[in-house]
């Protein structure tokens, strides 16, 4: 079996959860497909398949055969370098082999190619790179039919259909008021009561406006299933057909005919269209987080090509291109500064409002803002490989994934419509044969009400819209959930295990204390200690040097250096003999240091690493270095405790140092002296105690523990491997994000339960009420139209969480 692949596709044409279930079932039956996940709210399909047995084209064809449409983008290119038809053939074959490309016909005569591709799998830069390798050049003409444009076009179409339907339905609604005693005083033009006039108004609504429902119903029935389209088409057709029968019966009579239901079918369709339009707009708002992230992306870049500056679309930037960035511009790609100095606003990544200084050799992140200087940047990551693209991809995957809680809704949705059809038929028979014997009008009215009040959409949207809104809002806080499953599991956590270095602490030692002794001043102590450390590459030595430089002190030139493993340094600088190290070093070199031991032990009790310093054989004092806790750690730990969580710090440090750091951070429980390879075992031990555990870390040695924990959280300032292993990435490196993630998970799960309760409760109560005859069909239709809207609007409340 070859290595499996995963493909994501945008699918249009789904109207309810039954549609999503049908596509999912159809895809899972395909040879070579091992799993398929179809999400109604995001209108996406994620398929895992064996490329040896099937491919993108076959999967797309299957979705089309089921009666739905895979949304693709088209990009038209001019081709440079073709000399014959064989060139065109080579380019066409190469483009069609790219994952996500549906079709790429090359026109040799016009020297153009129009590529139809899945934007979730391929990009313009992928297409260009593939053709570049063949020795040709693609030049973008312009893209059409993007997903956003297609959705706007569909929204405009829905609005136009709604207006057309409302204009024709209004006279029918006006005529309907004459049916009720309490509205009989309202004047109604006689023409509106004429059955043939009502027929003329209702027919375009039924067959022009209602046509998509007929098409959807036909496709569903052809595939031996049923969906909301079947219910709407059947219910409105029953009302229309019965009214048409009575209209023909009225031939030869004068005036209006009682018992017509033209207004029922027309108003039903109008209300359903109104509900669908609201739903579309609300669902669009649920992906606001993605839109905000995409707006951060630069649209163009200034590059040097053939010795000249050129402004090109961002998709055309290649790795190793030199990009010019002026003050105030967004940096278009991830790269390295090769020339220039500036301050860069990285708040979109780190959440920090203060700009960060950038010099030659420093890395920069695409979509951050160059504040005040001119920069030349060498492109390192472009297109879908940039940090922002990765963030967008993670959010999209999370919004398109299913949470385990959705399984119940999926199971119900799969059998919902057939059950409703059965109840509707039974309702008709009971009313026609028993409740109102022989009264066809009464029975058909109850039959229609049952059909149109049932709403599988509300059930299908209950979970995914909340997942979309919750994960999207979390992303705005710098919290990236890798999927709906992790968003759900996070709310069950009761224990948070924090790695010390880089998580609770800054991960970078700094000079904290300098205590001179005897005739020496602090300046002497620091200058000569730093001079000795210039020959060392130890992080503690680097911390001393950085601290001395920050104080503006000059460091004498080192003339001799010798490292004593496990003890310290022997050095000469500025004509002085210097020792920097442990008690053991001072004892071996016979330097009297007893008067410093009490202070040394005090500092060590605070979790600091203390080094004794001697100059020319005389104790000069001591310097202390510590990996200090982050400014936000204490507050973050307090927030976690307020949420009812048990907080544990895990570290490889000795217990004394660990206790000092834990005390400063407000952490009561510690696991100290743990080797990197033992961290996962400690997590497993906590799980055996019945704890739902999260591990939070930032380093390579945290990866096994992150994978073992129920939820692994990676601090975004850490290593790529930790972030790859984790279920949640906290891109701001702030421990407060842990509490935010847990709170967001709890609020999202609460929102999902509210939605499921509403959707299940609505259908459980609405269908019997309609069957008992307490609802007119048009009222039932209005309830159905707005039930799914209410679910989406409730989910959107998550976007306002602060």
UniProtKB/Swiss-Prot annotation:
Membrane topology: Multi-pass membrane protein
Record Pfam families: E1-E2_ATPase, HMA, Hydrolase
Transmembrane spans: 162-181, 196-218, 230-249, 259-278, 412-434, 447-469, 756-775, 779-796
UniProt-annotated binding residues for Cu(+) 1: 16, 19
GO biological process annotation, one example: copper ion homeostasis
Domain HMA: 5-71, 73-139
Binding positions (Cu(+) 2): 84, 87
Keyword list, A-Z: ATP-binding, Cell membrane, Copper, Copper transport, Ion transport, Magnesium, Membrane, Metal-binding, Nucleotide-binding, Phosphoprotein, Repeat, Translocase, Transmembrane, Transmembrane helix, Transport
GO terms, molecular function: ATP binding; ATP hydrolysis activity; copper ion binding; identical protein binding; P-type divalent copper transporter activity; P-type monovalent copper transporter activity
Family: Belongs to the cation transport ATPase (P-type) (TC 3.A.3) family. Type IB subfamily.
Further remark: The copZA operon is activated by CueR and indirectly repressed by YfmP.
Subunit composition and interactions: Monomer at sub-stoichiometric copper concentrations. Homodimer at higher copper concentrations. Forms a heterodimer (electrostatic interactions) with CopZ during the transfer of Cu(+).
Role played: Involved in copper export.
Listed name of the protein: Copper-exporting P-type ATPase
Species this protein is from: Bacillus subtilis (strain 168)
